Amino acid sequence: MTDVSRVLKEARDQGRLTTLDYANLIFDDFMELHGDRHFSDDGAIVGGLAYLAGQPVTVIGIQKGKNLQDNLARNFGQPNPEGYRKALRLMKQAEKFGRPVVTFINTAGAYPGVGAEERGQGEAIAKNLMEMSDLKVPIIAIIIGEGGSGGALALAVADQVWMLENTMYAVLSPEGFASILWKDGSRATEAAELMKITAGELYKMGIVDRIIPEHGYFSSEIVDIIKANLIEQITSLQAKPLDQLLDERYQRFRKY
């Protein structure tokens, strides 16, 4: 098994910690909030309020299930527009009260169903990209599994983007890439090699800012590393003048 095929397999493993796991292990007193105030509540995106080392923060992330029943309830981690609108509602609330935002990302992509398109999937993702680029509080995004397409990017316009060691981040799935390029989805591993989807490759290109080492899908060490780094980096980002924070975020994405 090549390194990229191993990463692809491990990034999608159902045994990975989820957003709700991290929300309860890293933060204190996490309280989930629901609904987009327009249509409904989307179980594929979760979010709420918590404390990090005594500081209020907003935590948002894409939630996959750990079994079939849970995955059905979470739509296999593929958000509908109401999920992205819920996330944006919580981010604007965080901006109003001066709370830093931490997002966790694990999705193959936004849900491509007819209903999602009818309710404005593209608009919801685009609105998040626009609003996050100018959100007046620090944002840190962490890839904890799959980071697929615009569905992932809609929570990743951040001051810093981190990846766990054995996760992936790409414009689309390797299967989709292979199907478009060669009309053969079975060449996914070959496509993944060309796409440069691994944390190490993306770090070298400056697309991600930090790689969190993994020692199995769950270890207290991973949680401790993420928590310590979040405390350090949020403190550093909060110390910057607002104009500098926003300009550096803008320049971060302009360089691509």
Swiss-Prot record:
Main location: cytoplasm
Reaction equation(s) it catalyzes: N(6)-carboxybiotinyl-L-lysyl-[protein] + acetyl-CoA = N(6)-biotinyl-L-lysyl-[protein] + malonyl-CoA
GO biological processes: fatty acid biosynthetic process; malonyl-CoA biosynthetic process
Molecular function terms from GO: acetyl-CoA carboxylase activity; ATP binding; carboxyl- or carbamoyltransferase activity
SUPFAM superfamilies, per database record: ClpP/crotonase
EC number of this enzyme: 2.1.3.15
Entries under Pfam families matching the protein: ACCA
Keywords: ATP-binding, Cytoplasm, Fatty acid biosynthesis, Fatty acid metabolism, Lipid biosynthesis, Lipid metabolism, Nucleotide-binding, Transferase
InterPro entries in the record: Acetyl_CoA_COase_a_su, ClpP/crotonase-like_dom_sf, COA_CT_C
Full protein name: Acetyl-coenzyme A carboxylase carboxyl transferase subunit alpha
